[in-house]
Every structure is written in structure tokens, then in C-alpha cells.
Amino acid sequence: MTSTVIDIPDSVRAKIDVRNLNFYYGQFHALKNINMSIPDRKVTAFIGPSGCGKSTLLRTFNKMYGLYPEQRAEGEINMDGENLLTSRQDIALLRAKVGMVFQKPTPFPMSIYDNIAFGVRLFEKLSRSEMDDRVEWALSKAALWNEAKDKLHQSGYGLSGGQQQRLCIARGIAIRPEVLLLDEPCSALDPISTGRIEELIAELKDEYTVVIVTHNMQQAARCSDYTAYMYLGELIEFGETEKIFIKPHRKETEDYITGRFG
């Protein structure tokens, strides 16, 4: 097993602390003894070749694997002093604290307004005016309010792909999570929409801990404060993004970033 190089200052406050995490798809050992601390209110990027475990690791943070009995995680994922893997916390409450946006836009088959209000109604009892304010706040945070304010009661499917993805981000932050997970959120978008999402990520980190999976090296370099390089289910190197891209400790990391991988 490869030894991990971690270069994170001790002064950095961790939001999620991962210790000896292993993950299995049936008999397949997908994540191997992962140890890392995700910094609070920063953007952390997971990079690596397809199948290296990036998305699997991301999805352990809100237990997305829980729907599949053959999938299991072992070890610790600590958040606010609680091990999420052994906690009896209601899974809906966990996913309210740890929101997620997927690779392809997934608006609900309802109006733009109800896309935002749906999750809020599960956890809060707001008056109509309070809900109106929350919808406007979330859409504004996602840089979508000006484009959507005159068609709030039209279907979310009527939005462009980039707008739909921003709608999904607005839906995720409407319930005011502490962590936002983004699984390749720009892979299906054009460059202009991608640029808007990246600008949004930069703004969101002031209030949320953001973790993004991306195959786009330039995106990781532009958007993230910290970067983790993974390969074959192992964490190879984790550190400040500038250092990872300019002077990585591990040759494997350098080879991947410079395109000499494989």
C-alpha cells in the first residue's frame, strides 16, 4: 500500500476528519485506508484518473451508499465530533447538513419555486412570505435569481443545462447545509456555464465547506484551495492546491498533473 503525503498546515481547522476509511463494493476493495482532514470553509478538489475512487470517497460523506446493502464503509468519518459511519442520526438530517450536486443536472419535475421549497418544507415550517424570501435567497446565492424571477412557477426543465445545474445548487443550499459536495458538476456544461459555476463555487466557500470531484485539472487549479490526488483507491497526495500543481511531493502526482500519467 502506498504511503500518503499530506501537506496541510496544523492551523487549518478541519470540518470532516477521515480516519482509516475503507470502502467495498461487495468483495471489491474500492477505498484503501484513507486518512485526511477536509478543511472548513475551503474548496477541496479530488482529482485522479477514472475509477480511482474520487466519487466513491465523496459519496461516503453523506452515506449515499446506504441504499445498496452490498456496499459498506469501515473506519471513521468524523464531523462535529460524531462518526457518521456509526451514527444513528437520521439519514435525511445528515443529507440536509451535507448537500450534494451530481454530474448531470437533476431538477425535480416541478416548478422552479417548488424545486427550491421542496427540501425546505421537509425540515422547516415557514410562512409563505418566509418561503418566498428563502427561494429568492437561494436563487440569488446560485446567481440564478435575475434569470428565473419572472418564471418561478414554470417547470425547471425549461431552463438551460447550466441554469438547471445552478438550480440544483440553489436547491442544495436552500436548506442551509454545512457541507456541499459537487460530483463533476460542470462535465455536461458548455464553457460559459462552467465559468459561472466556478464563480459560484468561489463565492460559496465563504459560508460552506465545498468538496468537488473533477477530471479537469485547470478547474481544480482555478477553484480549489486544497487538492487530493487519488489512484487505485488510495490517497497519494493531499495539500494546498498551489503546491500540488507547482511542486508536488510525489512523482505519481506530478506525472498525472503534467499529462505523463499512464
From Swiss-Prot:
Stretches that traverse the bilayer: none
Catalyses which reaction(s): phosphate(out) + ATP + H2O = ADP + 2 phosphate(in) + H(+)
SUPFAM superfamilies this protein is in?
Answer: P-loop containing nucleoside triphosphate hydrolases
Q: Which residues bind ATP?
A: G48, P49, S50, G51, C52, G53, K54, S55
Reported EC number(s) for this entry are: 7.3.2.1
Biological-process GO terms, alphabetical: phosphate ion transmembrane transport
Could you give the subunit structure recorded for this chain? The complex is composed of two ATP-binding proteins (PstB), two transmembrane proteins (PstC and PstA) and a solute-binding protein (PstS).
What is the protein's name according to its record?
A: Phosphate import ATP-binding protein PstB
Q: Native species of this protein?
A: Cupriavidus pinatubonensis (strain JMP 134 / LMG 1197) (Cupriavidus necator (strain JMP 134))
